[in-house]
């Protein structure tokens, strides 16, 4: 795993959120077709860049773009 690959996963994640709006972790995983660890790396990347809003609704983590 290298930085370029994580950047690609982050791009897939950003695109899914841009097209579909707020998604749960389960929905985001389905939309991106990423493995769980890949999705967490992508979310970390985008969160570090300040591009995500992460909240909890009914014990489910919800993610959207800022």
Feature-to-residue mapping (PLM):
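Short amphipathic alpha-helical interface segments
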Residues: 3-31
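Residue-level signal for short amphipathic helical patches enriched in basic/charged
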Residues: 20, 34, 49
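Residue-level detector of family-conserved "landmark" positions at structurally sensitive sites
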Residues: 27, 39, 56-57
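A short, conserved structural fragment
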Residues: 47-57
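Short alpha-helical segments that sit at the start of domains
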Residues: 1-13, 40-41, 59-61, 66
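Short amphipathic alpha-helical interaction segments
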Residues: 34-45
């Amino acid at each position: 795993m290298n930085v370029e690959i994580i950047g690609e996963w982050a791009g897939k994640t950003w695109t899914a959120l841009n097209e579909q709006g707020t998604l749960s972790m389960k929905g985001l995983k389905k939309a991106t077709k990423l493995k769980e660890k890949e999705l967490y790396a992508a979310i970390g990347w985008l969160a570090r860049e300040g591009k995500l809003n992460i909240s909890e609704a009914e014990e489910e983590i919800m993610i959207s773009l800022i």
